[in-house]
């Protein structure tokens, strides 16, 4: 339907409720009570070379919960659909990522956040194709560029918005350019974010944070009244 150079046009018809999918390490089971928001999800795992969809999407690492915390800090009026593919060591595999994106073809979500990157030997034409299919549906895909790198998968694809965090000297939160390899640069400054019960940590000096922050800002655009309303 559109690539990221047309992203502004996607928001002409705004909606009052937005659902974001987060593909990550899951989410803390107290999150929805902490922030009074709707949370649902699944786990996707590879067992004996076979993809399994499971009900467990509890976060054993904290990374996925921090991602959701950054997003809801930008846009409180939001619904989450969580897909857990990373374990307590933040390890996963490309098969689970592909299966997760395929699952989202049939889910009513507006934005897909991937604060992750695939290893350099993880190029797979199936991943590129599924990102395009989701993009053709009008779903916005956001991915963090691998820390310390200028390109990574899936951020490198033209149907995915590639995000990096930096220490910006200028007096603005982000820079966006559709015709560059890194499409969006977000101001990267650590703040306190919820990770688990009674536990807030300083988080923000990484590209995962930057991708989550952009996702939250776009969610806020979705929920804001349109000038054409």
Where are the model-predicted features located?
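Mature extracellular/periplasmic domains of secretome proteins
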Residues: 10-14, 92-113, 124-137, 149-162, ...
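Conserved small/polar residues in nucleotide/adenosyl-binding loops
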Residues: 222-229
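Subtilisin-like peptidase catalytic core
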Residues: 53-119, 215
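Extracellular S/T/G-rich loop segment that most often corresponds to the catalytic His/Ser-adjacent loop
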Residues: 24, 152-220
């Amino acid at each position: 339907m559109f690539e990221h150079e047309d992203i502004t046009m996607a928001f002409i018809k705004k909606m009052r409720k937005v659902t974001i999918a987060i593909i990550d390490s899951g989410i803390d089971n107290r999150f929805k009570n902490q922030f009074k928001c709707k949370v649902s999800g699944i786990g996707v795992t590879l067992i004996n070379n076979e993809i399994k969809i499971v009900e467990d999407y509890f976060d054993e690492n904290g990374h996925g919960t921090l991602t959701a915390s950054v997003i809801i800090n930008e846009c409180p009026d939001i619904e989450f659909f969580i897909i857990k593919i990373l374990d307590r060591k933040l390890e996963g595999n490309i098969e689970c990522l592909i299966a997760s994106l395929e699952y989202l073809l049939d889910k009513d979500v507006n934005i897909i956040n991937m604060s992750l990157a695939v290893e350099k030997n993880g190029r797979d034409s199936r991943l590129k194709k599924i990102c395009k299919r989701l993009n053709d549906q009008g779903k916005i895909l956001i991915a963090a560029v691998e820390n310390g790198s200028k390109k990574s998968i899936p951020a490198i694809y033209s149907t995915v918005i590639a995000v990096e965090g930096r220490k910006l000297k200028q007096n603005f939160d982000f820079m966006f350019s559709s015709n560059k390899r890194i499409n969006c640069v977000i101001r990267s400054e650590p703040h306190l974010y919820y990770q688990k019960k009674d536990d807030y940590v300083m988080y923000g000096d990484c590209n995962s944070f930057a991708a989550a922050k952009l996702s939250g800002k776009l969610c806020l655009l979705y929920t804001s009244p349109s000038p054409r309303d």
